[in-house]
Regions:
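Residue(s) in the substrate-gating loop at a strand-loop-helix junction
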Residues: 141
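C-terminal substrate-recognition "lid" of short-chain dehydrogenase/reductases
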Residues: 2, 80, 118, 133, ...
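Active-site helix of classical SDR
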Residues: 121, 157, 165
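Short, small/polar-rich loop/turn modules that mediate ligand/substrate recognition or access, typified
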Residues: 87, 173, 178, 239-241
Length: 252
C-alpha cells in the first residue's frame, strides 16, 4: 500500500475528483478526512470507505471561511493525530467572460478555488512542519496554464493556484513539505455537467467537442485520482512546485 499509515485531508471530497481520490487513498492505506459542504454525500463516502475496511471521518467545511478551515484541520488532527497529505480539491466553475461575470461569480470563484487552497494550507502547514514534513496537492486545471473561452473567473483562479503552488514549494521545501499541483483537463464530473448546462449545451455536444483532443475523450475521476496518488506518494519524492497535466493531450 503506497499510503500506509498516512493521514489525508481532502476538501471537495464528497463528489467528482475529490470523492474518487478519497476512495483511492483509503484503498492505498490512508486514513481519510473527507471534507465538503454536503453532509449526506460526505457520509456516503465515509460509509463506503468503512465498509471496505478503511478509516474515515466526514468534516463539514465551506473553504471560503477561515474559522471552518481551521476547525477542519483541528478535527482531522483530533481524529487521526496528524496530517500527512492535504489535497485541496474543492472548486467551482462559472461560464463567463469578463463583461458577463458578476462580482458575485468572481468573488465566489476566487474564494473557493484560490482562497480556499490558501486557507487550508495556512492552517495545515504548521501541523506538517511540526511533525517533520508532509505533502500538499492543489487541484489546478489546464485552464490555469492556458486560457479558455468563456471561463474568465475560473482561469484567473486556477492560474493563481498554479503560482501559489510554486511559491509554497519554495517557502516550505526545507520544512520537508512538498507542494504540487494536479492540472486536469475536462473530466466526467458533476461540475463538468453543470458547466455544459450553464453554456446551454447538451452534454453529448460537450463530449463531441472534447473529442478533438489527441486522445479523443474526456477523463474520468479515477484517472485524476491515480495521478494525484502519484503526487501523494514517495514515487514523487523529488517533485515539488510542479504542475502535473492530466488532460488527454488537450494543451499539448
Amino acid at each position: 500500500m503506497r499510503l500506509a499509515r498516512k493521514v489525508a485531508l481532502i476538501t471537495g471530497g464528497t463528489s467528482g475528483i475529490g470523492r474518487a481520490t478519497s476512495l483511492l487513498f483509503s484503498r492505498e492505506g490512508a486514513k481519510v478526512a473527507v471534507s465538503g459542504r454536503n453532509k449526506d454525500r460526505g457520509q456516503d463516502v465515509v460509509k463506503e470507505i468503512i465498509a471496505a475496511g478503511g478509516e474515515a471521518v466526514f468534516v463539514s467545511t465551506d473553504v471560503r471561511f477561515p474559522d471552518q478551515c481551521r476547525r477542519t484541520v483541528e478535527e482531522t488532527v483530533d481524529a487521526f493525530g496528524r496530517i500527512d497529505i492535504l489535497f485541496n480539491s474543492a472548486g467551482v466553475l462559472f461560464a463567463n467572460t469578463v463583461p458577463d461575470c458578476t462580482e458575485e461569480e468572481w468573488d465566489l470563484t476566487l474564494d473557493v478555488n484560490l482562497k480556499g487552497a490558501y486557507l487550508m494550507s495556512k492552517y495545515t502547514i504548521p501541523i506538517m512542519a511540526a511533525q517533520g514534513g508532509g505533502i500538499i496537492i492543489h487541484n489546478g486545471s489546464g485552464w490555469g496554464l492556458v486560457g479558455g473561452a468563456a471561463a474568465a473567473s475560473y482561469c484567473a483562479s486556477k492560474g493563481g493556484v498554479v503560482l501559489l503552488t510554486r511559491a509554497m514549494a519554495i517557502d516550505h521545501a526545507r520544512q520537508g513539505i512538498r507542494v504540487n499541483c494536479i492540472c486536469p483537463g475536462d473530466v466526467d464530473t458533476p461540475m463538468l455537467i453543470d458547466d455544459a448546462s450553464k453554456r446551454n449545451m447538451p452534454f453529448d455536444k460537450y463530449l463531441d467537442e472534447a473529442a478533438v483532443r489527441p486522445m479523443g475523450r474526456i477523463g474520468t475521476p479515477d484517472e485524476i485520482a491515480s495521478a494525484t496518488l502519484f503526487l501523494a506518494s514517495d514515487d514523487s519524492s523529488f517533485m515539488t512546485g510542479a504542475s502535473l497535466v492530466v488532460d488527454g493531450g488537450g494543451i499539448a
